[in-house]
Regions:
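Metal-dependent amide/peptide-bond hydrolase catalytic core
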Residues: 1-144
Length: 144
């Protein structure tokens, strides 16, 4: 039995990975005159941000906490996330809030799910301010 998780940045890539696993498993099975049973169980869908929503979130965050405190991640994150169900139905963006204190570099600080993480609870103030500003801006409608 081989088990694992497939994480991808698009459904197309996920399908290609599944096809590749199937081909390799069937090839190895045939080479050894063995039987293979392949089962895939869908987990969370791929999490894909709406570009306009991501721009909106970044703009609002920059206004609230300053452009130096915001960053657009250069590469997609392949987390398994239940928020992906929301993004499959409603345009939106997954926004990360750093819990790193101002005394540490976020680029080298331990990630949030690490056993070495050191949260600065003052970061929650920024999170509440940013999310509140996004909600208020969204509810006020597009600029005229």
């Amino acid at each position: 039995v081989i088990e694992g998780t497939i994480r991808a940045i698009s459904e197309r890539t996920r399908a290609k990975v599944r096809d590749g696993i199937r081909r390799v498993a069937e090839g190895v099975s045939a080479a050894h005159d063995a039987q293979v049973i392949i089962e895939f169980h869908d987990g969370y869908p791929v999490t894909v941000n709406n570009p306009g929503s991501a721009d909106f979130a970044l703009d609002v965050a920059a206004e609230v906490v300053g452009a130096k405190s915001t960053v657009r991640l250069p590469n997609p994150v392949m987390g398994a996330e239940d928020f992906s169900y929301v993004l499959n139905r409603v345009p939106g963006a997954m926004v990360f809030l750093s819990g790193t204190g101002t005394d540490r570099d976020p680029a080298t600080a331990a990630p949030n799910h690490s056993n070495r993480v050191m949260f600065d609870e003052a970061a929650m103030v920024n999170g509440v301010a940013v999310y509140s500003a996004m909600a208020l801006r969204h509810l006020s409608g597009p600029p005229s």
